[in-house]
Amino acid sequence: AIVYLDEIVEARKDTTVIIHPLSDDRRLLPIEKKGQVIEAVDDFMLVISYNPGYQSILKDLKQSTKQRFMAIEFDYPLPDVESRVVAHEAGVSLEVAQRLVKIAEKVRNLKNHGLEEGVSTRLLIYAATLIRQGVPADQACDVAIARPITDDPDMLRSIIEVVKAIF
């Protein structure tokens, strides 16, 4: 059995400590309101995920929780892989997907230089889907890539310039 808790940092701090006895050698989940204790089966795995780049000082895992898990770090997929993912998921040509990934690469370079976070593959798929539905590429990139990641007018202009250069 596998339990997957996505975006664990979004959970209230007082709720994440509930998994402590489940995630250590006790392998138990106490349910206080019912007076029950559930014991994990031998092949039980608890998997949590979160995006460290989206955290603030207020949204981080407690050290006592972090230390109960192995950590694996993922970066964006390689451009050729990401292009194939975008093309497949959005139903656009590989050429359109490659252009969107090129935009993402350029915009991701602005992270920590005015942008808090880069362009996710999800946003590329949203933009590609709009393009497939007939929305002009510049407009699709504006509403699905640029505006979701920044409100800063100068940064928006910069991203739109990147879009114009590639599309």
What are these regions (language model features)?
Residues A1-F167:
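C-terminal regulatory/interaction module of P-loop NTP-utilizing enzymes
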